[in-house]
Amino acid sequence: MPREKKKRGRRAEKSQSKRKREDEEGSDSPKRQRTTNEDNDVQAGDDYIPLVTHDTEKEQEQGQEDDTPFYGLLDTEEQEYFSKASQTLELNSFEDDDDKRLFIESVYTEAKGKELKIACSQSCSRLMEKLIAMSTPDQVKALFEKFSGHFLHLVQHRFASHCCECLFIRAAPIVTSEMEKPKDKKKDRKQTTETNGEDGEQDEPMNQKPAMDLFLGVVSELEGNWGYLLTESFASHTIRVLLLILAGEPLADHSNARVLASRKKENVDSITSTAQAELTIRESRQVPAEFNSTLRKMISDLSAGLNSTYLQALATHPIGSPVLQVILSIELGCMGKEKVKDKSSVFRRLVPDDTLETKEEGVNFLNSLFYDPVGSRLLETIVRVAPGKFFKTFYKTIIRERIGSLARNEIASYVVIKVLERVSREDLQSAIESILPEIPSLVQRSRLNVIKTIIDRSTVRSADTTSLAKALESAYGEDGLVRLKTILGVEATDKDAESVKPKAATSAQHLHGSLLAQAMLQAPGRLATMIQTSFLAAPVEILIQIAKNSTASRALQEALKPSKSNTQFRRQLLPQFYGQMCDLSLDSSGSHVADALWDATSDLVFIKQRLAQELVDNESALRDSFLGRAVWRNWSMDLYKRKRGEWMSRAKGLDNPRVSAPTADSSAEPAKSKLDLARARYAARAEQQEKPDSREQGPRGKKQALSAPSGLLKAQ
């Protein structure tokens, strides 16, 4: 008799037990089930941390995924259209502004009702950023209203968060413009309503909310979720932008640029933004009073649920620390001294008032930030914007005795740079003496940022740099040629030398060396002489090699800048370029050196004539090259060939708009300041008012009173 087919082994037993469990689920078990309250019978103290199991973590993740809305996907035809529109905007090959405006309006018409889809699309979100950067204020506000109600989800989206940042940055100047001209806008609205009549489509922009209300709506929409948005990888960037906008701080400032976006982010604004738009985001803006109150409430809500321990842990968090930097810069720089003294402020919760003097927890916290790659950036922010009283205590208690060892460290040296930029002349001089023993090791490891900062600040503070020059001379050697090669990194030109070190590391070292050489050339005295003697000791081949190097040529251009103190140096160096003008003019980096030779020979006309003759001899080669034509134009060689007399006057600085405009007009009257112009207008107005009443009034009447400012002008 055939047997029944059965599975053998553990798999069969497992399936049978699974069926039994499924059958038993329907029947009520007589055993009492444990409730959730009984799991947490333990009394929670201050140090109690609840146990989060894997099941609860999965449930939370599943809940977050379910809460995230799905706005839909674009069709294939829509994706093709928007990708072509993105390419068109990037090329920016429009005939005029009207053509560009009509194209943007057509794209907005096609995108109507699909704005959220485009913002969340991987391929089309960049189009949305470009559109926002090129849009008019009405279009920006209309798109702002389309996003309203969805910002909590959009700021956490990988692609839509970038669109939100771009939208906030573009809408920030609109708030200021609406504050400055509210009356004119009312008149414009009346005129437009009269002309448009009862057309609903034309009246739609007139019903828009003010930009201030739109921003306040974003804050209220995100309110209550600051805790997890603070450390969310995408939303944290948007929070930083929002904080700076509410505070009226510059959005493209050098100090704020690194906390707004990462280095990997594509700079779409550089392609689409205009000069006026760049100017508006680089300047501080006037913000309404509602922004100030909202900003204070937002910062208090951000830090309300965070104790001092969590705040100190947030200082080294790679995502939360930049937000903390923005909060500290706003608290210490915008909210005044009262906020700094407030014990509930973020700054005082991180560093209590008396901890630096008693050497308690605050000092340990600050010491831990020096060597942390993330925390050191927060410490740089504290050093940059902290009140003067706190900075002096911080410098005397923590920095002064160990500034040499801190300057030697790769991470802590950046904090030392910020400290050196703020200390007084006496403290700078003592800091130089403390760092001098570390100069050889800094030079050996190519960590030249601290040395460059010392030279720059010594030039500003008029500090003595003789001891620093001796230390650098002993570290680099007395041979000028070897010193120049080491600083600028021109000795590593062979293939074997280039294969020893990574390309990125060597390029960074060469950049720091070039910046150090430029700083030494700008400093008076022995430091500048060190670089000048090194250039004079270099043969022609090395000079041409330096001129053709994109990094090292900057130092050569700085050395060629004319001044009264380096006339003898230029007289000796410039003949080294005889016979090299054509070679330099045809090189991308050397062409800049060729342009610098025009200014370098402003008081050495006989050298300029010889260099110009070399350009004439190689005219055909120069005209065949784009770089050569630029050098030919900058040297005014057409004028040299046709009107030699006019070229000579321009070469001497008598008719050169680039160089001699200030010197040519030196005999004329200096430009009047705004105060002088205002005084002149006041005096002219006074003379006009006094003419009809001069017969009726006496010597002490209106005429004498009004003529007093003109008398003051003559006295001045």
Curated annotation (Swiss-Prot):
Protein origin, superkingdom: Eukaryota
Q: Which family would the database say this protein is a member of?
A: Belongs to the NOP9 family.
Give me the stretches of Basic and acidic residues compositional bias: 12-37, 687-699
Q: Name one GO biological process term.
A: endonucleolytic cleavage in ITS1 to separate SSU-rRNA from 5.8S rRNA and LSU-rRNA from tricistronic rRNA transcript (SSU-rRNA, 5.8S rRNA, LSU-rRNA)
Gene3D superfamilies for this protein: Leucine-rich Repeat Variant (1.25.10.10)
InterPro entries tied to this protein: ARM-like (IPR011989), ARM-type_fold (IPR016024), NOP9 (IPR040000), Pumilio_RNA-bd_rpt (IPR001313)
According to the record, the residues making up region (Disordered) are 1-70, 179-207, 653-716
The Pumilio repeats extend over 110-145, 146-181, 305-342, 361-396, 397-433, 534-575, 576-613
Compositionally biased tracts (Basic residues): 1-11
Q: What is this protein called?
A: Nucleolar protein 9
- What PROSITE patterns does this protein's entry cite? PUM
Q: What does this protein do?
A: RNA-binding nucleolar protein required for pre-rRNA processing. Involved in production of 18S rRNA and assembly of small ribosomal subunit.
Q: Name one GO molecular function term.
A: RNA binding
One Gene Ontology CC term in the entry: 90S preribosome
Q: Which SMART domains match?
A: Pumilio
Q: Report keywords, A-Z.
A: Nucleus, Repeat, Ribosome biogenesis, rRNA processing
Transmembrane segment boundaries:
none
Which organism is this protein's natural source? Trichophyton verrucosum (strain HKI 0517)
> In which compartments does the protein localize?
Nucleus, Nucleolus
